[in-house]
Amino acid sequence: MKIRKYVAMALCATVAASMAACGNSNDTQKETQPAAADNTADAATADSTADNTADNASDAASGDLSGTIVITGSTSVEKILNDMKDEFEALNPDVKIQYTGSGSSAGIKDTLNKVNNIGASSRNLKDDELVDGLQQEVFAYDGIAVIVNPANEAIADITEEQLADIYSGKITNWSELGGNDAEIFVVSREASSGTRSAFEELIGLEDAGGLTENAATSEGNGPVQAAVAENENAIGYVSFSFIDDTVKPLTISGVEPTAENAKSGAYALSRPFLFCYFDDSVTDAGKAFLEFALSQQAQDIVTSHGGITVTE
């Protein structure tokens, strides 16, 4: 994680005599994360990093930070990121964070094109998105919940294969799964959505023939949630933080969509929340925000929105 570099830099500023040695040490720590790291390995790395930075939240409020941090990308991180933004701006009144929820793919593209300072993604980066110098920081984990309308009492559990069959159009009626004789109203996300990309990959939708042309698409977790809440025969998928009593989450092969199950890997539909950036695109304020995202203050925000912390 690049955040270790910033901690080392802070130590160097405090102990001026060791500045040169620390600079050399920082250089040896530079590395770009792989596109799809194992959840357990990610968790171990993130846990170690967060332990080193959890007590450093006050450092973000140095009073010397100023400027604008431009972040674009995932809508799944919207609630978490907006609260982190508010907290960080309160600590640093001269810093403003401009966050645009444009979807993970768009945020990553903006980062690669250096349109933003930091990209936010709710999926691992693909091989063709990994370029020299691109850095990643996992700041939380999330699970993707499959939801139906609460009136759909007969359906409580589903498998990944059944999801692929529904979303590819092979299964079109709830009766085929032991439910009511009613046509399934399939709700998906827009093409640029990181949640959609992760969902389709996790259920093997490409191998099943791709998304059915009969699927309705909604831009954002909220609209998907609303569509399912309004239609007794609908099925959709959202981040865990969008589960409430207006929809009913299904178990996946008997495993409940909980934070513990997602972090451990027992729950099949889980993914990381991460930032991606280039060193030369991130200002001092941006570096401080990346550090803040792993602090206890920020991780408490993750928890408050049903996310899974890097130390959990």
PLM segments and residue spans:
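Bacterial Sec-dependent N-terminal signal peptides
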Residues: 1-10
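Hydrophobic helical h-region of N-terminal Sec-dependent signal peptides
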Residues: 11-16
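C-terminal motif of bacterial Sec signal peptides marking the signal peptidase cleavage site
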Residues: 17-21
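Exported/periplasmic ABC-transporter solute-binding proteins
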Residues: 23-37, 42-47, 51, 55-112, ...
